[in-house]
Amino acid sequence: MDRRYFGTDGIRGRVGRTPMTPDFALRLGWAAGRVLAPRGNGLVIIGKDTRVSGYMFESALEAGLSAAGTDIRLLGPMPTPAVAYLTRTFRASAGIVISASHNPFYDNGFKFFSAQGTKLPDEVELAIEAELEKPIETVDSADIGKAERVVDAAGRYIEFCKSTIPNGTAFHDLKLVVDCAHGATYAVAPSVFEELGAEVVAIGAEPDGFNINEKAGSLHPENLRAAVLAQRADAGIALDGDGDRLVLVDEQGEVLDGDEALCIIALARAGEGALGGGVVGTQMSNLGLELALKAQGIAFERAAVGDRYVMEMLQQRGWLLGGESSGHILCLDRTSTGDGIVSALQVLAIMQATGRPLSELRKVMAKFPQTLLNVPLNGGVARDALLSAKAVKEAVRAAEGALGGEGRVLLRPSGTEPLMRVMVEGRERRQVEQIAREIAEAVRSVADHAG
């Protein structure tokens, strides 16, 4: 059965356009209540990021769930991984996050978590879509769901985050700059690090409903770099709007992406005998990560892009650690989903345990130069036809020949936007950039003619 609304990371779109409308949110809440409540205790947790539209969608979801006879706990602005955690601790049937992650304020979305704090299985998402096609029928008045606000949600999550590093680990000698992207972590992230003893300089922590991710957070580390250098900080931590991504900056102002953070954590876990198997990356993971892990005898597998697929492969293998270069890191020995704060804590704890600065820890991996270009596509272009077009296949074949087995070429359509992503990596940056431009031009030419 084809999906109509759910993508690789829930439902997402421009506010005011289907499906991101109040009436859709009302129907979604009702449909979700009908499907999810019978699978557990009839309770659903709702959290959101700091977008102004979140309040509108929260009310609509609440009404729909209540009409289906489902009780609700409202967390208010709270990171996505906090919703996953609190869904588990409340023994709820499901959790819903109102967020569009790293997108601008005018987008929003709905992410769902199972009772275990993981993404919903495909069959459950399809069941919700099937219910969406039915007219809303409100339960009897005596059975209408009740909504309550959870006033101590932030404190519960802060304590959980602190519990993910060894007892006795403290950051009293660390000065940190934390960029909250004017998003859902603005209140909790600085508190986590401060309570562990660090001196914290918070930036991107003044949300107004419209500035989420605006020149801030993990997609815009330039402000964090400048602040780390100006403050002479030991490290910088950049989170995205909903708090599930992490980008780091070392004390010299150099940016570390998710691959580098994942490598640091993996090698430290392996050294402790606590890795629990291999590591899962994605098709976009840097070749340097794979080589660094394999040099230490650590198995490495690539999943499709998206933390959902990393999670699926980890579960299939029975492994505990995986992630994406974008900064989604899954530490399943600590939590059930990607968590930027928890991932940052793991790296900082390694810094403290080894006495090595971040600029030294990052040397465990030598990154290959990598270029990623996004080619906009018009609505009439079939993705499969584009990938199989003769001109595109010839450009890829020529690129692979030029790289000579010391690099990779990857073309993949975006799961959330009308884009074709062109990724090229190899040993020489100029060559990589030139090859990426040539392939992107071939894709653009075929797409334009198809439109």
UniProtKB/Swiss-Prot annotation:
Enzyme Commission number(s) from the entry: 5.4.2.10
GO molecular function terms noted in the UniProt entry: magnesium ion binding; phosphoglucosamine mutase activity; phosphomannomutase activity
Protein's name in the database: Phosphoglucosamine mutase
Cellular-component GO terms for this entry: cytosol
Binding sites annotated in the UniProt record for Mg(2+): 101, 240, 242, 244
Source taxonomy: Bacteria, Pseudomonadati, Pseudomonadota, Gammaproteobacteria, Chromatiales
Originating gene: glmM
Cofactor mode of binding and number, as noted: Binds 1 Mg(2+) ion per subunit.
Family the entry assigns: Belongs to the phosphohexose mutase family.
